[in-house]
């Protein structure tokens, strides 16, 4: 019985005036639907699907209480009855699906990407070009009143509660920290004064909404910035928030300006649950822990160890809206696990795009991307069991088509089998597990160790042929590129060929960074070891330092090799990496003493090493044992022309279609959408 396997996770939580059906919280995540035409109808479908999937309680993306509090100009806000009316379609859909939902009230303060931003003090954020206006007493009172008004409107719109965003370096958090609050009145100075705003907001919201309405306070328990809160201050605030009327306290980890990763795939699972655990017993209301909890096993362990009363998972419910139901039914092996990549969610959010999910392109597209049963069954051949081919084959089979999936390798995965070997990308093992199960459950006829040719496919009598044949690494025209010390990235990551102690990596795209990460690590990656991760990034394991970092020196492991990461382009090395993860990869490699060079001309490779010229300077030689080529790839389309000439219906997807950069997000999306239309 699954209930026996996850007794803590699936246990109801009695909040006094209402009961949550289990201990899962779908954490707040801005989707971009909030501001789009027809967005509320799409939000209704998005949240209702997750309510049907069994989530105990959901929280919307951040909604500003006023214009100045929006994360950017035109950001969604809730300050009028007219705006509240638009939300009713969301709450009604969630309740009809058996769920509960809270609205998050988020005031960005000095993080607002707008010249209208306000803050406790006129101190500019390091991640924002705008300097905030310092609020006067009347201005502070207005902000509090706007929080209260927003909560009242949320209640009228049918929400079961609100989450007051008091962490991540936003407005309320800015009042709490001395380095952003330099006021000398009753809103600044002592910690009792600095926490006054948070307490007043919770207290006045409770007074306005009455006792039978959920109030979650998102409390920053680990700021990860030098001038952050001490643990004594965090305890003081938690007690005051409880006294003011909060129903639940949610854990916030890290300010947005912090230079320590908190949710990326390099972060160990449940890396910060022990932070929440330290607050257990200090307050009597339930505590929610968060960050990198992505499987029912991890969630159950966190709860069983007493770290928290609930677990918050945001991205895992993007990846699989049926996460809870599958766990409860004993089908956890069918869960499409969040890999923590950020590529289609947070990178999209910060790029002004609609949020989705690399492993589930239906996320936030529930009203237009659906895998409906077919009217006429087709025989479909898919060639290539990489990300694109797996998505196409399983979606087509799920819809009812008869699908045969061919691959010349002895296992599915394609480029996933390369990615999973990179330290910090171990979550790809979960994606492979998911697809293996999906291939089995949808009835795909999987034929591994099978290379097909045009005639084989023509003779097969298929109605549709999908070529997901992938790529081949490109070999650049460098004198000596055939030298024995030259390896491709597939030689290193897939074939695991021996590599010397000094290595030059040619090409600083995503693959070049992955290879460099692989080369500098030895033994267990810190992504698999919570304590080692904390030490590597300079987090106080005792939680005694201010902000969790003051005076703590980072202790990265010594690199296994000396690595030079090179690129021809003049731009910053790694400039093309993800918006929310690129800095993590660059910092991680710098901590491993990787030398990154741009504007590099490759002159030749010989016994002495790699001869280069940097920025049109004098020629020099990098004395290295090996040179690893990560200079792009070419599409493998050898079957296409013959099949077209034979009159077959042929579709190219994944790297076989566009090989400029390996992109699992595009591959899975493309494969899924094609299969949904066939």
Where are the language model's segments positioned?
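Flavin-dependent oxidoreductase catalytic cores
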Residues: 1-383, 387, 392-403, 411
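Conserved acidic residues
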Residues: 56, 160, 247, 309, ...
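Flanking helices and flexible, charged tails adjoining ferredoxin-like Fe-S electron-transfer domains
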Residues: 202, 366-375, 398, 402, ...
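Short beta-alpha connecting loops at secondary-structure transitions
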Residues: 259-265, 286, 309-310, 416-424, ...
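A short helix-to-beta-strand connector/capping loop
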Residues: 307, 439-446, 482-485, 559-561, ...
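Rossmann-like dinucleotide/flavin-binding elements
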Residues: 379-405, 447-461, 469-478, 482, ...
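N-terminal Rossmann-like dinucleotide/flavin-binding domain of flavoprotein oxidoreductases
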Residues: 414-462, 574-600
């Amino acid at each position: 019985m699954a209930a026996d396997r996850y007794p803590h996770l699936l246990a109801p939580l009695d909040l006094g005036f209402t009961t949550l059906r289990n201990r899962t919280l779908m954490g707040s995540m801005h989707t971009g639907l909030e501001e789009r035409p027809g967005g509320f109808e799409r939000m209704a479908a998005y949240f209702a699907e997750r309510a049907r999937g069994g989530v105990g309680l959901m929280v919307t993306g951040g909604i500003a209480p006023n214009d100045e509090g929006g994360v950017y100009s035109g950001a969604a806000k809730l300050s009028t009855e007219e705006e509240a009316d638009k939300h009713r379609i969301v709450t009604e859909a969630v309740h009809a699906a058996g769920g509960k939902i809270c609205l998050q009230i988020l005031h960005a303060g000095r993080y607002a990407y707008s010249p209208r931003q306000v803050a406790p003090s006129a101190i500019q954020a390091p991640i924002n070009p705008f300097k905030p206006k310092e609020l006067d007493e009347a201005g502070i009172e207005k902000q509090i009143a706007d929080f209260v008004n927003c909560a009242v409107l949320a209640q009228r719109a049918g929400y079961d509660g609100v989450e007051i965003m008091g962490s991540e370096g936003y407005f309320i958090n800015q009042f709490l920290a001395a380095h952003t609050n330099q006021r000398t009145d009753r809103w600044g100075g002592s910690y009792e004064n600095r926490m006054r705003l948070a307490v007043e907001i919770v207290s006045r919201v409770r007074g306005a909404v009455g006792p039978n309405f959920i109030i979650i306070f998102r409390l920053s328990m680990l700021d990860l910035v030098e001038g952050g809160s001490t643990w004594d201050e965090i305890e003081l605030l938690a007690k005051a928030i409880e006294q003011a009327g909060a129903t639940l306290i949610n854990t916030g980890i890290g300010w947005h300006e912090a230079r320590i990763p908190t949710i990326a795939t390099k972060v160990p699972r449940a890396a910060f649950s022990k932070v929440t655990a330290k607050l257990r017993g200090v307050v009597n209301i339930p505590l929610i822990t968060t960050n990198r909890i992505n499987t029912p096993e991890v969630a159950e362990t966190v709860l069983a160890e007493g770290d928290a009363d609930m677990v918050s998972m945001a991205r895992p419910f993007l990846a699989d809206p049926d996460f809870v139901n599958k766990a409860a039914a004993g089908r956890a092996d069918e869960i499409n696990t969040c890999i923590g990549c950020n590529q289609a969610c947070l990178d999209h959010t910060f790029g002004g795009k609609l949020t989705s999910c690399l492993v589930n392109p239906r996320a936030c597209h529930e009203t237009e991307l659906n895998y409906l049963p077919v009217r006429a069954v087709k025989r479909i051949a898919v060639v290539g069991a990489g990300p694109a081919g797996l998505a196409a084959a399983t979606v087509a089979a799920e819809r009812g088509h008869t699908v045969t999936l061919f691959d010349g390798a002895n296992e599915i995965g394609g480029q996933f089998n390369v990615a999973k070997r990179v330290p910090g990308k171990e979550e790809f093992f979960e994606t492979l597990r998911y697809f293996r199960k999906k291939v089995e459950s949808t009835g795909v006829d999987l034929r591994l160790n099978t290379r097909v040719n045009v005639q084989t496919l023509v003779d097969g009598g298929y109605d549709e042929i999908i070529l997901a044949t992938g790529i081949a690494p490109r070999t650049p025209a460098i004198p000596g590129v055939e030298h024995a010390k030259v390896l491709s990235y597939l030689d290193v990551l897939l074939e695991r060929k021996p590599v010397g102690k000094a290595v030059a990596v040619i090409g600083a795209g995503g693959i070049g960074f992955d290879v460099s990460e692989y080369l500098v690590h030895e033994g267990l990656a810190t992504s698999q070891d919570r304590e080692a991760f904390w030490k590597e990034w300079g987090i106080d394991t005792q939680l005694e330092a201010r902000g969790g970092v003051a005076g703590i020196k980072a202790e990265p492991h010594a690199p296994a090799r000396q690595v030079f990461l090179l690129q021809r382009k003049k731009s910053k090395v790694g400039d093309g990496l993800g918006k929310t993860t690129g800095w993590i990869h660059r910092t991680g490699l710098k901590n491993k003493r990787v030398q990154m060079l741009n504007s590099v001309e490759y002159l030749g490779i010989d016994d002495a090493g790699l001869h280069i010229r940097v920025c049109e300077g004098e020629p020099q030689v990098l004395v290295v044992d090996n040179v690893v080529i990560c200079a792009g790839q070419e599409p493998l389309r050898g079957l296409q022309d013959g099949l077209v000439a034979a009159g077959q219906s042929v579709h190219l997807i994944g790297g076989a279609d566009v090989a400029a950069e390996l992109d699992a997000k595009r591959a899975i999306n493309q494969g899924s959408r094609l299969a949904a239309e066939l």
